[in-house]
Regions:
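C-terminal active-site "lid" helix and adjoining low-complexity regulatory extension at the edge
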Residues: 212-216, 225-299
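A short linear hydrophobic-aromatic micro-motif
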Residues: 111-113, 141-143, 218-221
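Phosphate-binding site of ATP-dependent enzymes
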Residues: 117-202
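Short glycine-rich anion-binding loops that position phosphate/pyrophosphate groups of nucleotides
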Residues: 45-47, 117-119, 240
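Conserved N-proximal alpha/beta basic substrate-recognition cap immediately N-terminal to
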Residues: 2-108
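Short, low-complexity Ser/Thr-rich regulatory SLiMs
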Residues: 157-159, 223-227
Length: 299
């Protein structure tokens, strides 16, 4: 087994490689030679060299591309929801690319998150629209209706199983006035924690279903939970998450046994991936109705 990191300096890719005994492939000037009998873990890259593409790839790059782009991701989930037959939907917030609709939401009393950067992380490129909003909506490729949340989680999923679960918790070294409860990231006073984990079952279920919906083999799913609605909402999936401690151990355990299951990838899951890859290239394929049973996606 090999690992292709999105950048050579990825500490998590290095740690995972050491844990499972996998060699890392250089992102440039590599002498790696691919073949169908080799397995490569794609660690967050939306493009892979020709030699790597000759191998069995865990998290194909076209699907990683969809996951890394917030608008593509929401559209992919929306299309999955529109064509699933068993009513098992991935819950996502309302979204639009239409600034007029975003303005309407604000004037109707909602808070809207304008996303200026589709591939940003840690709150990068976010602008909140709320209250007495008299100006025109800022020009942005994506607007998402804000959902109030009781908790925010990161659920690590690998091969259809939750390998670790973290909660975003307040840092106590940050003053009250510097805490931003709406955008919970490190700069706004939050860290990942495992204490006081009382996680609704729907959180894990939504994380697993979101990965299945776009054909990801693994990913760290960011989810918020609205207690009043008793609903978990999927926000995004990270395909190159930070790995330390218990999180790293969970991934190592799953990847050590991975080659036993990739031989039996369901035909319909492969078809779903082709659909997602078409979306990544900007071509809209005609999706086939699917239903989800366990890890398998079957016609």
């Amino acid at each position: 087994m090999f690992i292709f990191p999105y950048k050579n300096a990825s500490a998590s890719a290095k740690a995972l490689g050491l844990g499972i005994g996998a060699k890392r492939i250089k992102t440039a000037n590599s002498r790696f030679k691919g073949s169908p009998d080799k397995v490569v873990i794609n660690w967050g890259s939306s493009e892979l060299p020709e030699e790597v593409m000759k191998c069995k790839v865990i998290n194909p790059p076209a699907i990683t591309n969809v996951a890394s782009n917030k608008l593509k991701f929401f559209k992919a989930i929306q299309r999955f929801n529109n064509h699933t037959e068993d009513g098992d939907y991935v819950q996502i917030p309302d979204f639009t690319s239409d600034p007029d609709r975003a303005e309407y939401w604000v004037h109707s009393g909602s808070i809207v998150v304008a996303r200026h950067k589709l591939t940003g992380n840690s709150g990068e490129g976010i602008e909140l629209m709320e209250g007495e909003f008299d100006d025109e909506a800022p020009v942005a490729p994506l607007y998402v209706k804000y959902v109030p949340k009781k908790q925010e989680y990161r659920v690590h999923v690998a091969n259809g199983k939750v390998v670790d679960l973290q909660r975003k918790a307040r840092r106590h070294d940050i003053a009250d006035e510097d805490i931003n409860w709406r955008i919970r990231n490190h700069d706004n006073g939050f860290i990942f924690a495992r204490n006081d984990l009382h996680v609704p079952q729907s959180v894990s279920r939504q994380a697993i279903l979101a990965c299945k919906a776009i054909g990801l083999d693994f990913g760290a799913v960011d989810i918020i939970y609205n207690k009043r609605q008793e609903t978990a909402y999927v926000l995004e999936i990270n395909t190159a998450p930070g790995l330390t401690g218990q999180t790293l151990e969970g991934y190592v355990e799953r990847f050590k046994n991975w080659d036993e299951v990739i031989e039996e990838q369901p035909v319909a899951l492969a078809a779903l991936r082709i659909d997602m890859e078409a979306m990544a290239r900007g071509r809209v394929a005609t999706p086939q109705p699917v239903r989800v049973e366990g890890w398998d996606v079957v016609e």
